[in-house]
Amino acid sequence: MDCIECRGRMLCSRKVCPLMPSLRPQVSVERDILGSSPPSVFVGRYGYPKVRICPAVPPFTGDTKIYDTPEMWREVPVERVLEFRYSMILGQFRADVRRSKEVEVVQEMSLYDKPIDVEVSFAKPPSVRAFFDDVLPPFGASAPAKEVIIHSAPRPPKAVEKVYYDTDLRAVEAMSYLYERGVAVSHIQKLLSAGTLGVKRKLVPTRWAITAVDDTLSKQIIEEIKQYETIDRYRVFVLKESKNLFVAILCPSPWSYEWGEAWYPDTTWNRTRKVGVLTDSEGFFGRTTYARLGGCYYSSRLATAEYLRRIRRQATAIVWREIYPGFNVPIGVWFVREMLRKMYAGKYCEFDTLEDALRFVDKHSNLDVGRWIEKSTLVKRGRQRTLWEFM
């Protein structure tokens, strides 16, 4: 199994990811802390249905909302985001996903969109290793906790209160309701993970919840944009950010989607000497299998669907990402979602043909565009369609 495709998910059957240990910085805190949680919660996946549930708290008080709100990180350097995340200390409890005292605390924390003062008492001093994941933002130190107490909290947003008390509202409908009322995607993910949405409520591992929300919301938006006319010309967006290049080619044809990644050597998931290129795609009627590129596929699809909905058009979207040497810390799928949102808020160039669009991409890409074309299902399909129309 290729490391680029596995990404620390242990699909290679190893007991320990060989890439992760070298990525863990040294952090330390006291045995007991009182701090302002953004708020932030984490639900693990190992041992399900008995999993780790963790309130996350920095060892200080104040306005910490930005520490767990990816929507606020678009203009923040990655190094600064990592500082935020390393200060978030996890108090670990082992609990059943359905009900326990600790579950109730985590559920209450998830309701708020402003910082709350939380006290955590640890059974032993927190470890000096930070926590990394391919889907989640990093966390700082962690340790088994004896007790967690919420000292003060604001009132939850009204939309959140409504779905929390409506136990007949399905989780999918609750997500849509919250999203349409301006609740941040990251907050909806937190609510789903804490088991505060739906009819049969239970904790959902945080990495699953993040992807589930991106997937669910984007599918709902896609069904809407399928009713719109297609764009008239090819549009190309480009964004260079934090040793990454993002490119989107929007084509004047019915909805379909492709996400591709090119990992250069000395990056998070590529310790070889060659550039690794992977793509995955779906047609007009969507997909029935989990994307091989994992959570980034769904977060990028959401950002793309949001843009098309905003302009009330549909298109075939070919979206590629190049990751350059030195970008070697897994920071979570939020980075893709928020960078694409930033890109789609910017300017684009228009072209009459796919070939012209590809030539433009080639000027910005460090990778020969031929490598992308070789891996791209939708570029090949677009070329065949153009040839057929010409004949």
Swiss-Prot record:
Q: Which GO terms describe its biological process?
A: DNA repair
Record Pfam families: Nre_C, Nre_N
* Gene Ontology molecular functions: zinc ion binding
Q: Give the ZnF (C4-type) ranges.
A: 3-17
Q: Where is this motif: PIP motif?
A: 384-391
Name the UniProt key words of this record, in alphabetical order: DNA damage, DNA repair, Metal-binding, Zinc, Zinc-finger
Domain comment from the record reads as follows: Contains a predicted C4 metal binding domain at the N-terminus, which could be a zinc finger DNA binding domain.
Q: What does this protein do?
A: Involved in DNA damage repair.
Can you tell me which family this protein belongs to?
A: Belongs to the Nre family.
Assembly, in brief, is: Interacts with the DNA polymerase sliding clamp (PCNA) via the PIP (PCNA-interacting peptide) motif.
Q: Return the protein name.
A: DNA repair protein NreB
